[in-house]
Every structure is written in C-alpha cells, then in structure tokens.
C-alpha cells in the first residue's frame, strides 16, 4: 500500500530500482531505455516509473539530494514494496587529476562525514560497502560495453557548500577517493539495515581541481554509459 512518500501499491515496483537524484533524470531514463513504461509515483514530484528492459521488469525513481532524502525513499521501497536491489545512478565531483570529466565511477565503498550510519550502528564505524555481486556485474557490463569504469571508494558529503575551504579535498585525494557525491553511504547503510543489496554508479559531472563542469542539461541526458552499465548489470545478475 502507499506510504507517506510513495503513492504506489505492492507489485508496482520491480525488485530492482535504478535511482538518480533528479526525478527528471528518472523520467529520461524511463523514456529512453525502457519499454511499456508506466508512472508509479508522483508524490512531491519524485517521479517513479516501471517498465521493461530487454524483457526484464525494472523500475526507476528519483531519490532527491542528500542522505536524509535518499534514505526515506530507499527504506520505503525495500520495506513496503519488496525491492531487493537499489542501483544509484548519479553524478559526482572528482578530486584526483587522473579522474576526468564524464568518467564512470563504480562506488565499491562510500566514506562519509554524515553521522547516520553511526546512529544505526550504535556509534561505531560502519563500513558502507556495495554488494560484491553487483559490483562484479557492473564491472563486467562496463567491459562488455567498452567503458573503462573506475572502481573504488567515493565520499558522501552532507554539505554541498562546505565551509572547509578545500582542506578535506586534499585528504580525499591522498586517500584515493574517486568521486564526491551526497548519497551512497546512506543508501548502503539502509540496504544493510533492511537486508537488501545496493550499488552506486556515478558519472563525473565536475572536477573540483580544474573547475571543469557539465551543464544541468548534460547531466540529465548525456550520462548514458552509466545507465547502460546499470541496466546490463541487472541482466547479468539474473544469470547468477
């Protein structure tokens, strides 16, 4: 039945949901890559759709910006609608010079300055990691598509406009962080808490060092390699 944030019924969502932050990107994914699409959520404009990809039922829905927003939607999808796998498909900023604009980054783990996972884990550090099988399938899908995806740690920040002055970016670069975004650590924590599986795949939308960036329109429509990797990885997962 419907929740406070999702006006769908059990069965409206597939067991796998792709989740961009932007609901308009969710609409673009559904209209571009899925067949037999129907809208399954529109509460607060957070659009959700279900359709098929090469005959496989798949859903896509926005999760908003930041860990609090994405945690609400992922929790409800898992506990109220039977979703088993979440794949975040979003954008990230690069801090390393060897990571380039539009590179695809697969988030094997997610560091964070948020305290949400410590709240879940009785004030202990929680290793927020993606499901290994989903990582492997995404890597294999990327190779099959000829995409040189990067795999490693990303950083989920609570603040988009940080007062830090850039010092933390130096630390991230030293520790090999591939990209900075705002949701993965929270999604991995929710998945662990409620027995689901999760993965984050990002496209580098801007570079913190060089100040290169993609436009909002590009972020909505041109990150197709990332979406193809996510969709093909679902099909690979079905063969396991």
Curated annotation (Swiss-Prot):
Keywords: Glycosyltransferase, Transferase. GO terms for molecular function: purine-nucleoside phosphorylase activity. It is an enzyme of class 2 (transferase). It catalyses: a purine D-ribonucleoside + phosphate = a purine nucleobase + alpha-D-ribose 1-phosphate; a purine 2'-deoxy-D-ribonucleoside + phosphate = a purine nucleobase + 2-deoxy-alpha-D-ribose 1-phosphate. The record marks 219 as: Important for catalytic activity. It comes from the Bacteria. HAMAP family: Pur_nucleosid_phosp (MF_01627). Homohexamer; trimer of homodimers. Catalyzes the reversible phosphorolytic breakdown of the N-glycosidic bond in the beta-(deoxy)ribonucleoside molecules, with the formation of the corresponding free purine bases and pentose-1-phosphate. This is Purine nucleoside phosphorylase DeoD-type.
């Amino acid at each position: 039945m419907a929740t406070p944030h999702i006006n769908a019924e059990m069965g409206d969502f597939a067991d796998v949901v792709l989740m961009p932050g932007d609901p308009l990107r969710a609409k673009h994914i559904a209209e571009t890559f899925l067949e037999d699409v129907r809208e399954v959520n529109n509460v607060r404009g957070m659009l959700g759709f279900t359709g098929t990809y090469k005959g496989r039922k798949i859903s896509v829905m926005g999760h908003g910006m930041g860990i609090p927003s994405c945690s609400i939607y992922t929790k409800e999808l898992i506990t109220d609608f039977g979703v088993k796998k979440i794949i975040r498909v979003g954008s990230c900023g690069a801090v390393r010079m060897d990571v380039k604009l539009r590179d695809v980054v697969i988030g094997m783990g997610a560091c964070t300055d948020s305290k949400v996972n410590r709240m879940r884990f009785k004030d202990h550090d929680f290793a927020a990691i993606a499901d290994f099988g989903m990582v492997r399938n995404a890597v294999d899908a990327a190779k099959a598509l000829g995409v040189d995806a990067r795999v490693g740690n990303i950083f989920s920040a609570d603040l988009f406009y940080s007062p830090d002055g850039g010092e933390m970016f130096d630390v991230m670069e030293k520790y090999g962080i591939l990209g900075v975004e705002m949701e993965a650590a929270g999604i991995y924590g929710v998945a662990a808490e409620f027995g689901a599986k999760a993965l984050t795949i990002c496209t580098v939308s801007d570079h913190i060092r060089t100040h290169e960036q993609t436009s909002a329109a590009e972020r909505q429509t041109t990150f197709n390699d990332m979406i193809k990797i996510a969709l093909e990885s679902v099909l690979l997962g079905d063969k396991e």
